[in-house]
Amino acid sequence: MTLHEVPTILHRCGDCPIRHRAVCARCDSEELATLEQIKYYRSYQAGQTVIWSGDKMDFVASVVTGIATLTQTMEDGRRQMVGLLLPSDFVGRPGRQTVAYDVTATTDLLMCCFRRKPFEEMMQKTPHVGQRLLEMTLDELDAAREWMLLLGRKTAREKIASLLAIIARRDAALKLRESNGPMTFDLPLTREEMADYLGLTLETVSRQVSALKRDGVIALEGKRHVIVTDFARLLEEAGDDSDGGLPV
């Protein structure tokens, strides 16, 4: 695996774009200084594997920029995308060395990594880190439960609208923007990846995206740039209430 190490001096914690949402969100300046001593950066190209299922992972990390997918493979070779890692999401399990899924960069990916052992030691000494990680874990559990509803009960149109709403709200939160006005973002998944993630066919995804565009729910510039002029209407199409369903 070819990695491009990013000099730490280019990425001070206080200037980090995910500072207000990542595992370090509650840390004070002294705690951030401690984190600075154990962190390093790794970048991956789109399509590159970050780690394979079953491998030992000697680090934990936060996604700084880019998108990654979590995928599990069945014994007969069938694969299922089981999650997305968006900016500020945490990957790795303190106290557990192996991972249960493949992590693959969907776009060019930059990760802020912490060596596992020093990070685990810091969690013992710095309650803010452990508290924030617990909060993020509970949010992820809530999201998983909502996703069960989406996959089990929602129509194809509602599934597409729900995924767009999740990405739009996360993008707005990272940019510290309100989600009650026009929203624009780049869709991080191809149509094929959306189909895999949502349990739909490629043809169904393409048809439903086109229908949402035709009905004025979204606008598209190229294949990836999405414009949502009325977020409340998108939520209606998703079958969600005003909080957008899944945590951001």
From Swiss-Prot:
PROSITE patterns: CNMP_BINDING_3, HTH_CRP_1, HTH_CRP_2. Pfam families: cNMP_binding, HTH_Crp_2. Gene3D superfamilies: Jelly Rolls (2.60.120.10), Winged helix-like DNA-binding domain superfamily/Winged helix DNA-binding domain (1.10.10.10). GO terms for cellular component: cytosol. The keyword Cell inner membrane does not apply. Residues 191-210 bind DNA. Residues 154-232 form the HTH crp-type domain. The keyword Transcription applies. Keywords: Activator, DNA-binding, Iron, Transcription, Transcription regulation. GO terms for molecular function: DNA binding; DNA-binding transcription factor activity. NCBIfam families: TransRegFnrLRhodb. Anaerobic regulatory protein; transcriptional activator of hemA. Appears to regulate other genes. Possesses 4 cysteines which may bind a metal ion (possibly iron). This is Transcriptional activator protein FnrL. It comes from Cereibacter sphaeroides (strain ATCC 17023 / DSM 158 / JCM 6121 / CCUG 31486 / LMG 2827 / NBRC 12203 / NCIMB 8253 / ATH 2.4.1.). The gene is fnrL.
